[in-house]
């Protein structure tokens, strides 16, 4: 394992041990289940709210432990809350809505969750029961995909779309579409339009990553953003706003960006400081091969806190369990197996005796932040990462690379 002041080297080996024992996986899943409300909703933390993406993530972790009753209740909750147009609100509490906007990426993630659970043992019956719900969600999501392939970050209740896209969200979106294509094939339906839309989203992510790298490589300041290419208000140096609008008024959702890398860099909101923008293109397979390895290596020093985990934000000494677990999967997918194994092991210091996980801690004092919070999405991310790196089932292929995803249902 290279020192964290260095870039990672090639990982050794193609398999890995199980970092969590079956008993530990069971403890963590039991803790997540203990927070599930009577209507099936899984909140972020006890007394907190829920959103569709993290709710699905919790269901995926419950499936890892074979808690199918709770998995079924989680999907039942989604079916009950789905709007007629196929979308969900962004924030829920028991009996109500706290954030009425829609997040297309979160709405699409039900496809990833259902395909994951199918491969873990939910089988064809689970897939058939909830596939209509997934289809409705994705039909709505495709309406939010812009001509360049990226997906808008939000839609207001009255249908007004957000003016910019997020790199991490579009990366996750294309993975969900690919999972939907695999599910459709399993059900002997055609994979289109899901696969075609996924290809467009993947191309948008790749172009966005390359454009930012070309424009701002070597120019990032201590905050992880370009010190020259973007002003403090998030505008590119040519006057292009971070919502993708050119200074002349041409919106990026009205036409496909041209070959100028400045246009593609402006398509996505500038979130360079956030770890998710760094690793999600790799985690979800939007970038692969040498390009993925290079992306992982290039910003390793900015985000890795030696022996502790991954910083949520590059210029803040806050290490989080979810980002560390997710990045471990991204590093694994990029071929850094040894480094990925060690990264996942670092989440141990955030594990609670109950099997829960602290959301994160601020260093150097190691203060639990925020507010000593134990979060279901953090626990779920660690369980899922353990499942992927240890290849406990064919479902691991969802996050470990093409060719394995299609096998996810064969042993169900």
Tell me the role of every PLM-derived stretch.
Residues 88-100, 152-165, 304-306, 362-368:
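Acidic/His metal-coordination segments adjacent to aromatic residues that form catalytic metal sites
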Residues 2-18, 56-70, 109-126, 172-189, ...:
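Well-ordered alpha-helical scaffold segments within catalytic/enzyme domains
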Residues 19-20, 51, 129-155, 162-175, ...:
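Extended ligand-binding clefts on enzyme/binding-domain cores
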Residues 1-53, 64-88, 141-149, 206, ...:
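Low-complexity, Ser/Thr/Pro/Gly-enriched N-terminal "stalk/linker" regions
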Residues 222-252:
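Long, intrinsically disordered low-complexity tandem-repeat segments
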Residues 51-55, 59-146, 167-170, 344, ...:
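Aromatic-rich carbohydrate-recognition surfaces in CAZymes
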Residues 287, 313-323, 329-412:
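CBM-like carbohydrate-recognition segments
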Residues 22-33, 59, 68-79, 108-118, ...:
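Hydrophobic core segments within long, regular secondary-structure runs in both alpha-
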């Amino acid at each position: 394992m290279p020192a964290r002041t260095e870039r990672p080297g090639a990982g050794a080996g193609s398999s890995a041990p199980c970092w969590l024992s079956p008993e530990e996986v069971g403890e963590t899943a039991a803790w997540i289940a203990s927070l599930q409300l009577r209507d099936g909703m899984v909140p972020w933390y006890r007394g907190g709210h829920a959103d569709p993406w993290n709710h699905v993530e919790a269901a995926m972790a419950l499936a890892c432990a074979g808690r199918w009753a709770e998995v079924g209740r989680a999907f039942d909750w989604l079916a009950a809350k789905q709007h007629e147009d196929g979308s969900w609100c962004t924030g829920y509490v028991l009996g109500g809505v706290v954030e009425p906007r829609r997040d297309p990426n979160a709405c699409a993630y039900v496809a990833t969750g259902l395909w994951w659970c199918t491969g873990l043992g939910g089988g064809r019956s689970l897939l058939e029961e909830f596939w209509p719900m997934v289809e409705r969600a994705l039909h709505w999501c495709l309406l939010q995909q812009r001509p360049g392939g990226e997906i808008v970050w939000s839609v207001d209740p009255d249908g007004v779309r957000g003016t910019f896209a997020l790199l991490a969200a579009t990366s996750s979106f294309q993975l969900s579409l690919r999972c939907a294509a695999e599910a459709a094939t399993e059900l002997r339906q055609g994979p289109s339009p899901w696969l075609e839309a996924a290809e467009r989203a993947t191309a948008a992510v790749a172009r966005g990553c390359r454009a930012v790298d070309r424009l701002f490589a070597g120019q990032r300041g201590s905050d992880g953003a370009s010190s020259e290419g973007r002003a403090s208000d998030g505008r590119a140096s040519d006057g292009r706003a971070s919502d993708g609008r050119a200074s002349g008024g041409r919106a990026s959702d009205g036409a496909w960006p041209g070959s100028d890398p400045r246009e593609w860099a402006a398509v996505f909101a500038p979130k360079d400081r956030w770890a998710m923008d760094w690793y999600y293109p790799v985690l979800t397979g939007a970038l692969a091969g040498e390009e993925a390895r290079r992306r992982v290596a290039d910003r390793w020093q900015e985000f890795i806190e030696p022996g502790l985990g991954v910083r949520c934000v590059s210029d803040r000494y806050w290490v989080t369990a979810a980002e560390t677990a997710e990045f471990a999967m991204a590093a694994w997918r990029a071929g850094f197996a040894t480094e990925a194994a060690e990264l996942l092991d670092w989440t141990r210091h955030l594990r609670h005796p109950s099997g829960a996980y602290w959301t994160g801690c601020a260093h150097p004092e190691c203060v639990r932040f925020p507010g000593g919070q134990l979060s279901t999405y953090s626990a779920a991310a660690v369980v899922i990462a353990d499942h992927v790196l240890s290849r406990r089932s064919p479902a691991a292929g969802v996050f470990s690379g093409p060719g394995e995803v299609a096998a996810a249902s064969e042993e169900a």
